Regions:
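S-adenosyl-L-methionine
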Residues: 26-68, 82
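Conserved hydrolase catalytic core segment
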Residues: 89-93
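Class I S-adenosyl-L-methionine-dependent methyltransferase module
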Residues: 95-197
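Active-site segment flanking the S-adenosylmethionine/decSAM binding pocket
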Residues: 203-242
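Cysteine-centered motifs
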Residues: 7, 21-22
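Conserved proline-anchored active-site loop of SAM-dependent methyltransferases
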Residues: 74-87, 98-102, 163-165, 216-232
């Protein structure tokens, strides 16, 4: 459905750097492979993310066609960037602003490290039965390998959680991971994110600030997709309460 903000259309769906033309906002334009030809369109985010809208991709594409005269799309609650990605693929002529408040881009930039870590864990687990609980020496070997990864840089604990923890459980750091049970759910293939953010202009701002900045521009469509009521927001880098829902709706 639609709503109005300073008389601008809203759509509610509940590595080279440059400056964008809006002086108040610094953006990072990822256009190593600008969309000059037909490129892959992802139907789900390349890395796990709580609340990505992969089940609504086909409907979202249909709704985008109603805004074929608009020139700027601002994804206020960018999340995994899936809506921004699809918008840019469907509308390569338009400017698409992806508000990466959860720093999903950092996870994508470290995808090779994540793949290497998971490959090493697959070697440790060997032919151990799938979905079985991991205990004893094997569990300690897992923890030792993950600790080693921490000493050399970034560890994507959210992605790691989907390979080791019971469904719906997530750890955000080593301490939390050590306190949870492990299961052999390790992904059997590498993750890929080729071209996922191509053409997007990536920012990291409070959604209110972004709405105020772009609300004065003509031809702007805001993609407003906040966390669902009742969703576990512990994996998000923002505090979200009932009052925030009311603020968005009003």
């Amino acid at each position: 459905r639609s709503m109005q903000y300073k008389c601008r259309p809203f759509f509610v769906f509940m590595g080279k750097t440059e400056e964008f033309c809006c002086p108040e906002i610094q953006t990072h334009i990822l256009h190593d492979k600008m969309i000059m030809k037909k490129e892959k369109t992802y139907s789900r985010a390349p890395l796990p993310f709580v609340g990505q809208k992969r089940m609504f991709v086909s409907e979202f594409k249909k709704i985008l066609k109603h805004f074929d005269d608009k020139t700027i799309f601002v994804d206020l609650f960018g999340g995994s960037g899936l809506l921004s990605h699809i918008t840019k693929r469907e509308r390569p002529d338009a400017v698409v602003i992806y508000n990466d408040h959860d720093n999903y881009r950092e996870r994508l930039e470290n995808i090779d490290r994540t793949n290497t870590l998971l490959r090493d864990l697959r070697k440790i687990v060997g032919i151990y039965p799938r979905h079985q609980k991991i205990t004893g020496k094997m569990r300690e070997a897992f923890l030792e390998r993950i600790r080693l990864e921490e000493t050399t840089g970034f560890v994507d604990y959210l992605t790691l959680s989907t390979s080791l923890l019971f469904s719906g459980k997530y750890a955000q750091n080593m301490e939390e991971l050590e306190g949870l049970y492990f299961y052999n759910k390790i992904r059997q293939s590498d993750y890929r994110c080729d071209g996922y953010l191509d053409g997007l202009e990536v920012v990291c701002y409070d959604y209110k600030e972004l709405a105020d900045t772009y609300g004065v521009f003509p031809g702007v469509v805001f993609l407003v997709d906040p966390p669902y009521m009742g969703t576990d927001i512990s994996t998000y880098k923002m505090d979200w309460k009932l009052a925030d829902y009311l603020d968005v709706l009003l």
